């Protein structure tokens, strides 16, 4: 399995197992958020994005920075009274995602060394109409690995 895949799987598993409030639906397969059942919120879509690589040492060691996009979707039930707003639910889920990623920044990689995982950007998507809310958390995983020569 590639290191990109190992990192993406680890992040998907970790976010699926995080402490409450936790997402109900965590996947790497794109989906139509409009077709999710009320019971499938909050939902997260994990996507591997850009990666930069550079030589680290002459012995075939390289450094890489992999971007992971965590697309989050929340839903307010729209009732009056003591119910969280879309903004409150979105902020709470963003905080839980960041806290969970910070619990183990190494991503438990066997074939390389993950130097660090860090959140670099949080974007609130304004195009969603209530009761839906959307955000994208961008995180970077910095790691080193050894290339094989043939």
What are these regions, as identified by a protein language model?
Residues 1-40, 48-150:
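Charged, amphipathic alpha-helical segments and their flanking helix caps
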């Amino acid at each position: 399995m590639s290191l990109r895949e190992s990192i993406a799987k680890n992040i998907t598993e970790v976010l699926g197992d995080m402490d409450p409030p936790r997402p109900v639906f965590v996947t790497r397969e794109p989906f139509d958020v409009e077709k999710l059942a009320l019971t499938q919120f909050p939902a997260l879509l994990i996507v591997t994005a850009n990666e930069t690589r550079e030589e680290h040492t002459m012995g075939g060691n390289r450094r890489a920075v992999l971007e992971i996009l965590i697309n989050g979707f929340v839903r307010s039930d729209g009732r009056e009274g003591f119910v969280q707003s879309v903004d409150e639910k979105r902020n709470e889920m963003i905080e839980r995602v960041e806290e969970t990623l910070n619990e183990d920044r190494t991503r438990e990689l066997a074939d390389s060394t993950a130097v660090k995982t860090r959140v670099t950007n949080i974007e609130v998507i304004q195009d969603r109409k209530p009761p839906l809310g959307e955000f994208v958390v961008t995180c970077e995983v910095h790691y080193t690995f050894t290339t094989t020569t043939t």
